[in-house]
């Protein structure tokens, strides 16, 4: 790069992470007196720091997997659920087995990710995973056995559906009646990459389910609150009553049903 580049050209190179960027080039930019060059350089350095932090977090979130891999457990499945708290809709569970060379920087608890980022990870996880599965447990089962047992059933089903048999499990605050070695981690979707991956698959699947439900019952606003007991949802329950997708074993739904029967 012998000729003096314009600020626009420099900014484009830095934004693209061009292969020609080396220590010599960066030293040249630091010595450049133009304010626009210094602004572009600072932006580039901030981006590098951000990427470095993401990779550090990525390594930290593989600590549990690496420990199990080192002990000879080749196929470690992470499991998580989405939808235990809502008044309507299913609880969705997912299981994911990641390869040892997995690269998913930025992946964390699905609730902390923007929708577009979550959707992107959803596709990427399915591409790179050794195996993945999703189980949807309907309202009828939730009402029959309770939400905790329904969640367990969903996780067992997700494990059964995996195309690769896991030999160890990482779970988000759950224990399953299985002989497989398993670790239950509080806030596991923030501590384990495998659990975080399963939380993304579960959440995207459930959000899409609730969006479809919103088309069937547009007056309830399911596309916004996804079944949780928000003010909007409770008002819709009082105004329109209970749908087949509402959990009759949950108190706010029971109270709505009782109120409408006596009115």
UniProtKB/Swiss-Prot annotation:
It catalyses: Endonucleolytic cleavage to 5'-phosphomonoester. A divalent metal cation binds at residues 80-81, 172. Keywords: Cytoplasm, Endonuclease, Hydrolase, Manganese, Metal-binding, Nuclease. GO terms for biological process: DNA replication, removal of RNA primer; mismatch repair. GO terms for cellular component: cytoplasm; ribonuclease H2 complex. Its EC number is 3.1.26.4. Manganese or magnesium. Binds 1 divalent metal ion per monomer in the absence of substrate. May bind a second metal ion after substrate binding. Its cofactor is Mn(2+); Mg(2+). The keyword Zinc-finger does not apply. This is Ribonuclease HII. It comes from Halalkalibacterium halodurans (strain ATCC BAA-125 / DSM 18197 / FERM 7344 / JCM 9153 / C-125).
């Amino acid at each position: 790069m012998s000729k003096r580049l314009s600020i626009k050209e420099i900014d484009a190179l830095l934004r693209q992470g061009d292969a020609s960027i080396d220590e010599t080039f960066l030293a040249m930019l630091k010595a450049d007196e133009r304010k626009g060059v210094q602004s572009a350089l600072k932006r580039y350095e901030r981006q590098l720091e951000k990427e470095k932090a993401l990779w550090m977090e990525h390594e930290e979130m593989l600590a549990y997997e690496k420990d199990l891999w080192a002990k000879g457990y080749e196929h470690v499945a992470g499991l998580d659920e989405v939808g235990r708290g809502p008044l309507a809709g299913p609880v969705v569970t997912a299981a994911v087995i990641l390869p040892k060379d997995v690269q998913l920087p930025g992946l964390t608890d699905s609730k902390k990710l923007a929708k577009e980022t979550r959707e992107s990870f959803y596709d990427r996880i399915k591409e790179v995973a050794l195996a993945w599965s999703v189980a949807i447990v309907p309202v009828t089962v939730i009402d029959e056995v309770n939400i905790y047992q329904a969640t367990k059933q969903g996780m067992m089903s997700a494990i059964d559906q995996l195309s690769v048999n896991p030999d160890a499990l990482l779970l988000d605050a759950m224990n399953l009646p299985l002989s497989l070695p398993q670790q239950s981690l509080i806030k596991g979707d923030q501590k384990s990459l495998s659990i975080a991956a399963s939380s993304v698959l579960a959440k995207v699947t459930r959000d899409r389910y609730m969006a479809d439900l919103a088309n069937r019952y547009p007056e309830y606003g399911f596309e916004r609150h996804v079944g949780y007991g928000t003010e909007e949802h409770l008002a819709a329950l009082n105004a329109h009553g209970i749908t087949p997708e509402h959990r009759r074993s949950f108190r706010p739904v029971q109270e709505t049903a009782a109120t409408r029967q006596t009115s």
